[in-house]
A protein has these predicted regions:
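Extended low-complexity acidic/polar segments
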Residues: 189-200, 272-300, 377-422, 431-435
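Gram-negative/organellar outer-membrane beta-barrel architecture
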Residues: 91-243, 316-320, 330-331, 404-436
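C-terminal outer-membrane beta-barrel translocator/porin domains of Gram-negative envelope proteins
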Residues: 106, 230-361, 369, 377, ...
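Bacterial N-terminal signal peptides that target proteins for export
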Residues: 1-9
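Short basic (Lys/Arg) and small-residue
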Residues: 372
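Bacterial N-terminal signal peptides
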Residues: 8-17
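Residue-level preference for beta-strand/loop junctions
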Residues: 31, 114, 147, 186, ...
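Periplasmic polypeptide-binding modules associated with outer-membrane biogenesis and secretion
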Residues: 21-111, 121, 135-154, 159, ...
Length: 436
């Protein structure tokens, strides 16, 4: 008990110290009329990347509240380890310390079917100084070393030619045996996601993707199967930041059509076609609220798929990216899903800048505890037989590039024993693309 009290006291001390440091970095009296704005420390970042995030304007009184929000938004770009402001009279100067933009490093991620994947990656977090992130990767499963392989190229940015059109491009080659769905996944994927900010808190979403599955035995064609995906949606986003959200709500609705191109005609008195063809209705809702160093988050991801869905596209529940009450296996597979989560975070150590041998980065520590709800079914209405629940706890390390490293332990009364997990990136993000 004494250790727990000391731990809480230490965390509160860090929190107070962080607030005190923030106040001192302002060094600008509230209400001072801003006559000009300057930037310092932008070695690789173009000024317009910063300017579009600023709320304090020349000719207006300086607001510390606006700066606090500016700082969160600028940190959300994942380009800077430190952001501070100073003013000499009305001359407002923003100072930045940039994150090391070239990252040659081991590549890793966790998936439900391949477990921990390791490999090599080369990433540039700020291509041309325009907040464009590009990354090439090779990964192999630690469980099936050099047998389950993945080759990937990713590129993304929140803007396109100065327009508020966020985009994310993905090229993925997979050579891997899927022991959850029991088939050899030799596939190619090209995917483009768009996010156009129509209003300050309203975005129009679009997606288009092409997949080619080699040796796709579930399509009645052992050579290959080609599938197109295209979808439209909208999102209301009132979060303070997209990364490490502390406050706000997010709601997204997306309608996507998936259709196999090389469908096969089958006749037996009556002709019909065979092939995957379904619609996906997605709802993604998130809400966060802070009280001191505590952050409460509640999320719900629901995907309903009317139509013909083949086994290689079934959802799987079990693992660090979906449901932490069990390990992934072929038992909990289904066409439709609902993932529910309630999580409490304790910010033990808020984001801290650091530098080693000229490489700038940041780190933070959060303690987490929560509840996972898993609902998965194939047809009709789901019942209690389709539901499982679990509690979990762990430690999150907040770091650049991958958002966070997650060390978690889950327990489900249905299983009766703890499950240990390691993951990267927020679960609300990885649960959207956990298949790969």
């Amino acid at each position: 008990m004494k250790k727990l009290v000391k731990l809480v006291g230490l965390a509160l001390l860090f929190s107070v110290a962080g607030s005190f440091a923030t106040e001192n970095t302002l060094a600008c009296p509230e209400g001072t009329v801003v006559s000009s704005i300057q930037f310092e420390g932008l070695e690789h970042t173009k000024p317009r990347v910063v300017e579009r995030e600023l709320l304090n304007k020349a000719g207006e009184p300086f607001s510390a509240e606006k700066f606090d929000l500016e700082k969160r938004r600028l940190q959300d770009l994942d380009l800077f380890t430190e952001v501070s402001v100073d003013c000499n009279g009305g001359n407002l100067k923003y100072s930045f310390v940039e994150i090391f933009r070239w990252i040659p490093a081991p590549a890793g991620k966790t998936t439900e079917r391949d477990g921990l994947m390791i490999g090599l990656a080369l990433a540039n977090l700020n291509v041309l100084g325009e907040d464009i992130r590009a990354e090439v990767q090779y990964r192999t499963s630690s469980e099936r070393f050099l047998d389950n392989n993945e080759y990937a190229f990713y590129a993304s940015s929140p803007y396109l030619f100065g327009l508020p059109l966020g985009w994310n491009f993905e090229f993925l080659r997979t050579d891997s045996y899927d022991d959850i769905r029991d088939y050899q996944d030799d596939s190619w994927l090209i995917d483009l996601d768009l996010d156009y900010q129509l209003l300050p808190h309203l975005s129009i979403l679009g997606t288009v993707a092409y997949r080619e599955l080699e040796k796709a035995v579930f399509t009645f064609d052992e050579d290959s199967a080609e599938l197109w995906e295209y979808g439209l949606g909208f999102a209301f986003d009132f979060r303070d930041t997209k990364i490490d959200t502390r406050k706000g709500v997010y709601y997204e609705y997306m309608l996507t059509h998936v259709k196999q191109l090389d469908r096969i005609a089958i006749c037996g008195g009556r002709c019909y076609t065979e092939g995957e063809d379904y619609w996906e209705l997605l709802t993604d809702a998130r809400a966060y609220y802070p009280v001191g160093p505590f952050v409460t988050g509640a999320t719900a991801l629901v995907r309903y798929r009317p139509g013909e869905v083949y086994r290689f596209d079934y959802f799987s529940h079990g693992g660090v990216n979906s449901y932490r009450g069990r390990y992934a296996d072929g038992e909990r597979l289904g066409v439709h899903e609902a993932l529910l989560n309630l999580e409490e975070r304790f910010v033990l150590l808020d984001r801290q800048p650091a530098s080693i041998a000229g490489v700038n980065f940041f780190y933070g520590v959060q303690l987490v505890a929560g509840f996972d709800g898993s609902l998965i079914w194939n047809s009709g209405r789901p019942g209690w037989d389709n539901y499982e629940g679990a509690v979990y706890g762990g430690v999150h390390l907040v770091v650049p590039a991958v958002d966070r490293l997650r060390f978690e332990v889950g327990y489900s009364p249905d299983r009766g024993e703890p499950k240990f997990f390691f993951g990267m990136i927020e679960k609300v993000s990885t649960s959207r693309w956990r298949g790969r």
